[in-house]
Amino acid sequence: MKANSGLKKSRTKIQMVLSALVILSVARQFFLGNYHNMFLGILTLILFMVPQFLDRKLSVTIPPGLETVILIFIFSAEILGEINAFYVKIPIWDTILHTTNGFLMAAIGFALIDLFNRSDRFSIKMSPYFVAFFAFCFSMTVGVMWEFFEFSMDWFFGMDMQKDWIVPAINSVKLNPTGANVPIHVDVQSLVVNGETWNLGGYLDIGIVDTMKDLIVNFIGAVVFSIIGILYLRNRGKGKLAASLIPQVRSKQEEEHSSRDQ
């Protein structure tokens, strides 16, 4: 209990510090006249409230450790990544966030299926492996839907969410001079765009490599959490690491106690 109380205090302090930094960022963007970034800052403050909203509406207790990871993830994606251009300044920033996203979405999927698993309205009780598999599938589905969103924004609104990738060589059937269905290897040193030569050391892939990389690291994050979830359920909720990361479904008694406290 003391350890959990300490985590809650740390979570609260981190949220206050991050919120203060976001407010300062919003004010700065306002004075700079960058209203798009100002909107992103306001959106960040709203997203900070999502864990508490889910806690109340779904009768799920989000551990302080997991909530802290969520808050840092939101701050890293919107304030550092978008407003401060960490996606450009730090090449692996996007990879880190997509891996974390796979982990977090698996946690949410785990909590959702656990709601059904513990509900008195359902007679079927699912095994730890099925719960973990559902969490994994939920995370991957969210990852795929996000890539659909990135593609749509690029295609219809001229954005660049699916980042470009320099590919130094290709293997292509199309470039085989004999016309045979045999790929040939071609090293690419430069490319020509509208008559202008760009010596980039390769050709410019406009999304497929970035998309596949994002899905692969999302897969890794989802697998890691699913393994943690299996161990947690097989050991009947024991383990400090798992307990600090896995949302807990509140019992009726805990829910009534929580309602009285509010």
Region locations from a protein language model:
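Short, highly charged, low-complexity non-transmembrane loops/tails of multi-pass membrane proteins
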Residues: 239-260
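Alpha-helical transmembrane segments of multi-pass membrane proteins
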Residues: 48-52, 73-78, 135, 139-146, ...
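Membrane-interface helix caps and helix-loop-helix hairpins in membrane proteins
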Residues: 30-35, 57-58, 83-93
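Interfacial helix-loop-helix junctions of multi-pass membrane proteins
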Residues: 83-94, 140-225
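Cytoplasmic-side transmembrane-helix entry/capping segments in multi-pass membrane proteins
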Residues: 40-42, 61-72, 95-98
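Membrane-interface helix-boundary motifs at transmembrane edges
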Residues: 4-6, 53-65, 120-126
